[in-house]
Amino acid sequence: MATTQQSGFAPAASPLASTIVQTPDDAIVAGFTSIPSQGDNMPAYHARPKQSDGPLPVVIVVQEIFGVHEHIRDICRRLALEGYLAIAPELYFREGDPNDFADIPTLLSGLVAKVPDSQVLADLDHVASWASRNGGDVHRLMITGFCWGGRITWLYAAHNPQLKAAVAWYGKLTGDKSLNSPKQPVDIATDLNAPILGLYGGQDNSIPQESVETMRQALRAANAKAEIIVYPDAGHAFNADYRPSYHAASAEDGWQRMLEWFKQYGGKKSL
């Protein structure tokens, strides 16, 4: 059996499940690139359809705590098959490598907690700029993120006024603040620039339903264009097909809802 690193997954993500989805890449172009950002060159993975008739709608894909490992790369490939230019930047690259951490608690304390939200949001702006220079339609800019990236997706929806749509998968909504994370999504409910869909698991021990309801109340009070779907039988990381937490029915429904959300709000094609 291949180890997590041999198979393209972060070591802290083990044990791997037998439900891993691998998207065929014969109809897409995919690979690694480097994106100039804040004086550095940020590694990123991107995928796009081989055939297109002009600039492509753009989806920024924000990683889980495990970085841009094989699951996130496959998410990009799936989006490319749907006609998007999908880009997943390595948002921890200045602070360290997720592959150097063997377990989740050490990864969180030794790497993830060291990454400032402000740095991440600025990096994502540079990803959008790179996309506009590399076949992407900046007027159809969208974002989705998972776990750690789900929280970042909420924050980015309040950060970039050019964003057209956002979908956050089981991202933290409330909780403690720090110098690197001065705000939680509940704090920016009044500042959202784009319609946002949240996808959550009813059995998620890390994001209690009280937290979800608090966010819903904040969104209603702000009259925000937002919706939160809770899948009663799903836990955290229910879309992570490489983990035991995978809940296929919820993941498949969430994926279709995401595509519909992007189609509804993603903006019109540039002339």
From Swiss-Prot:
Q: Which Pfam families match?
A: DLH
The EC code for this enzyme is 3.1.1.45
Q: Which UniProt keywords apply?
A: Hydrolase
Recorded superkingdom = Bacteria
**The protein's enzyme class:** hydrolase
* Catalysis performed (reactions): 2-(5-oxo-2,5-dihydrofuran-2-ylidene)acetate + H2O = 4-oxohex-2-enedioate + H(+)
Q: Name one GO molecular function term.
A: carboxymethylenebutenolidase activity
Location of the active site: 147, 204, 236
Output the SUPFAM superfamilies linked to this UniProt entry. alpha/beta-Hydrolases
Cross-referenced InterPro entries: AB_hydrolase_fold, Dienelactn_hydro, Dienelactone_hydrolase-like
* Gene3D superfamilies xrefs: alpha/beta hydrolase
What's the family?
A: Belongs to the dienelactone hydrolase family.
Q: What is this protein called?
A: Putative carboxymethylenebutenolidase
**What taxonomic lineage is listed for the species of origin?**
Bacteria, Pseudomonadati, Pseudomonadota, Gammaproteobacteria, Enterobacterales
